[in-house]
Amino acid sequence: MKEVTRERMDAFCEYLINEEKSEATVSKYLHDVAVFAEWLGTRDLEKIVVVEYKACLCEKYASASVNAALSSLNCFFAFCGWYDQRV
C-alpha cells in the first residue's frame, strides 16, 4: 500500500542529504510532501488523487509555485519507486 509515512519521509530526508541537496531544498521538499500528506488524509494514493491535488494547487498558487511543489512530490514518488504516481 502506498502511504506517506514518517519512516518514508525520514528515509527521503537522508536520501536528499546524501544527494548533497542544500538544506533549503531538503526543507522545501519535506514541507511539500508533508502538506500533500496532510491534504491526502486517508484517501488512497492514486494518480487521479495526485491530479486532484495539482488542480487544488492551481486554484491557489502561481504556476511556478505549483510546479515547485509537484517537483518535490515527483522526487519523493520516484524515491519510493512509485513512478506511476508522478504528474
Regions inferred by a protein language model and the residue ranges of each:
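Onset of an N-terminal alpha helix
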Residues: 2-10
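N-terminal core-binding DNA-recognition domain of tyrosine recombinases/integrases
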Residues: 9-87
